[in-house]
């Protein structure tokens, strides 16, 4: 389905609202390619849901999606930034969310306003953070492991210092004895 056809399926939108959303949607592929991320245009349809009316994937680079999710429903539980931007009418940045396919992403969301200032849609930039979360988990595991062995290392380090001081003390005593003789 085209963006125009998708917008016709949202009864809350006037013709002028659809024109505003069509203008926003016409730039989505450029945004996807420029940011190397998935870009969406969602329209609120009530009951804590939004309809994905357009999806642009970067031509080169990676996408967080196996398929085009145009026509699918976004929910407040999985995409809180989308619904905060709809409710507040302000951009929401850097919020974790979950895709329709269950992948973790980080979202930036910008409301699209009608000519009279109502939120009629949102532009969404999503970046897959699966690898980032795996790295964070590995880092936490390493930190826990280090925290466990750190006291042992410090004890060994301290005993090594004591032994070194003892050696220095003995060398000094031997030098003192030789200087007396």
Locate each region found by the language model.
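Conserved small/polar residues in nucleotide/adenosyl-binding loops
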Residues: 180
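A short beta-strand signature within small-molecule sensing/ligand-binding domains used
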Residues: 92, 102-111
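Short regulatory/linker helices and ligand/cofactor-binding micro-motifs at input modules
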Residues: 7-19, 150-154
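Structured interaction and signal-relay segments at domain junctions
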Residues: 28-92, 100
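Short alpha-helical H-box segment flanking the phosphoacceptor histidine in two-component systems
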Residues: 159-170, 174
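Signal-transmission linkers at sensory-effector interfaces
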Residues: 1-12, 138-145
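Sensory coupling linkers of modular signal transduction proteins
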Residues: 113-159
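N-terminal-proximal low-complexity accessory segments that begin disordered
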Residues: 17, 23-26, 32
């Amino acid at each position: 389905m085209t963006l125009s056809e998708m917008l016709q399926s949202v009864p809350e939108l006037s013709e002028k609202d659809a024109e505003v959303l069509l203008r926003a949607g016409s730039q989505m592929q450029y945004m996807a390619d420029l940011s190397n991320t998935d870009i969406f245009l969602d329209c609120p349809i009530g009951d804590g849901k939004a309809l994905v009316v357009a999806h642009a994937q970067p031509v080169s680079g990676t996408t967080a999606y196996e398929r085009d999710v145009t026509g699918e429903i976004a929910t407040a539980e999985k995409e809180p930034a989308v619904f905060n931007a709809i409710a507040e009418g302000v951009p929401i940045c850097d919020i974790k969310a979950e895709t329709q396919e269950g992948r973790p992403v980080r979202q930036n969301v910008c409301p699209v306003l009608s000519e009279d200032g109502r939120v009629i849609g949102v532009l969404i930039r999503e970046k897959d953070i699966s690898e980032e979360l795996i790295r964070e988990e590995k880092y936490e595991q390493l930190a826990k492991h280090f925290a466990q062995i750190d006291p042992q290392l410090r004890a060994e380090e301290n005993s090594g210092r004591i032994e070194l001081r003892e050696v220095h003390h003995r060398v000094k005593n031997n030098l003192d004895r030789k200087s007396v003789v």
